[in-house]
Amino acid sequence: MNNQKKIGTAAFAVLVGICSTVAIFADVESTGNLSVALNGAGMTQLVALAALVYLYYQQLINSNSMWHQQKLRERMGYGLVALIFTVCMIIGKEQTAHEDLKYGLFAVVMFAGYVPAFYLLVSFCGDWFYNQSLQQNAGKRPGKLTDWLFEKHVVLGVMLVVFMCRLPYLISFFPCSMSWDGGAQISNFYGREIFTNHHPPFVSFFYGSIAWYSQKWGCANLGMFLIPLTQTTLSAFAVAQVCAILKKMKSPYWMRWGILVYYAAFTVWCIFDVTVIKDSLYVPFALLFGVQIVYCLFFQEEFFAKKQNIVLLVLYAIMMTQIRNNGIFVLLFTLPFVFFVIPNKRKICMAVAVVVMLGITALLDNCIYPALGVISLEDKVDTYCILFQQTAKYAKEHPEDVTDEERAVLDALFDYDELPSNYEPHLADWVKNCLREQEGSETNPTGSHFAALKKDYHKVWFAQFLRHPLTYIDAFFECSYGYYYPEVGTYKEGLGFYVEERYMFTESMSDAKQIEQLAPARFLLEQLSKLEHVPGIGMLYRCGFYAWCVIFAFVYLIIRKKYVSMIVTIPSIVNLLVCMISPVNTCIRYAFGTMCMVPVILAVMWYQGKKE
């Protein structure tokens, strides 16, 4: 390379380095002043600029750099990931940007800075991961503890580790920690509220029967303790099965240790296991279902040789659908791909399994639960939360652009005058509270009011979308950005339920009571959640981080042409899409279905490298 080209390359590296530094340190919240938003003055920024310019320059001039060594497929794949990450960052920062800031102009600078920075980061991670996975680590003998835990006594050993990590929580929060949803489901069982299938009936019966009989038999504390004990046992078993599949895939021991520590010691998993809430039951079965899918895809002969593996797959699938309403979508989008890639001689067996899953699920939902007194909603309004939010934002920003006919339809469904002031991007409940008739109420037990107006509402929704599509797009981003933007923290009780004064106890449905003398221990455990502010570890508490992991994994597997392995990412992707239209933005428990599968996905990526 001649001097003129080197100078041009250096100038380009400096320009891109400046843009990347601006993007990394941008302050879009404090002021509308563009120069202040650049936030470029400071030694930290100078060090970052120097490092970035050096890295960019070396990538461009060094023939042995990642950029020059990568094939076109890798460049396109990593470039796509960098582009997606950049768009996520720009959308996320827009939500908190100062209203006077010319954000569109500033976003152009950030775009020019984020893309190369993310490309460099993603390329490094992808190349390192691939090169490391090619190493077989032959001849390296594990230590005695590692050998005992991950080779000789996987299930027993791993379950013991998980229980030991949960033990401080089980003791300190004895008998349990109560959530609003958990208390509401017990209230359904008690008959204090109309028992609908708004919450999964199976969980309501499970929680409610324990609360009822333990109170009736005079052992409220011991009875309620069965809930966290059951949830912890299920979690421990699920993690043990993850480690068992890691053993089959011969994952490196450092990876097994890291995954075990994540599942066993991460404070979010610990506190939710002792909390009465359906998500704590969903995670183990979602994880077990994912492990069975991995087993089926990569160890087919062994999987289909034992009928119990098919039975377990069916059981875990059914339990997923009965514990969270979105579990059915995981099945419907995952199993067709599994069916497509397995050999023809196995398809009949898998088809029968799918029919059994769906048949039992339909039987429970349409026959068993109604026979037990559960009222089936005609249409669940939570499904339409994002549409309601868009309607509310439209009413707030374009009140003059609503026709009399549209207002009449909307006013029949909502208290229209209250709709604009109740628009809250983080929480759709405020807009749902504007409904004239709440589903599950005495006057509207089946949600028939909304069902009758749904067709007319959709017409109004679509007509207003055509007039102001950007308003609808803005509303969607405002209500969902936390699930793909990793710089925003969790919303309201996102790190767990550390207090007991909830629905069930305040309504005197149970005499269960946490031990007052253990309040200091509960306080100390709550302080552990402050780890979310520690660099690196803090990312584990961000919903958007897990979305990025899944996006990276999905594209990485495309780059490596591991199309069968991509099926393992489908449950996480489905859960992520459901989160984006959910009633609450940045609610970490909604993201559990994605979070719990990320370590399994990473292990599969590593396993595919070992097979080459």
Predicted regions and their residues:
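Start-transfer (signal-anchor) and selected internal transmembrane alpha helices
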Residues: M1-C19, A41-L83, K102-R166, Q608-E612
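Membrane-interface anchor segments at the N-terminal boundary of transmembrane helices
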Residues: S30-V47, L222-L226, D474, E478-T569
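Transmembrane-helix motifs of polytopic, lipid-linked glycan transferases
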Residues: L120, L229-K250
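Transmembrane-helix signature of polytopic, membrane-embedded enzymes
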Residues: G157, V242-A265, P284, F304, ...
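Extracytoplasmic catalytic/substrate-binding loops of multi-pass membrane glycan-assembly enzymes
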Residues: F173-Q185, I194-I210, G218-L222, G593
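Short acidic/glycine- and proline-prone juxtamembrane loop motifs at membrane-interface regions
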Residues: I271-Y282, I323
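Membrane-interface alpha helices of multi-pass inner-membrane proteins
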Residues: N309-R324, L335-P336, V356-I360
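Membrane-proximal stem/loop segments at transmembrane-domain junctions that anchor or position
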Residues: L372-I515
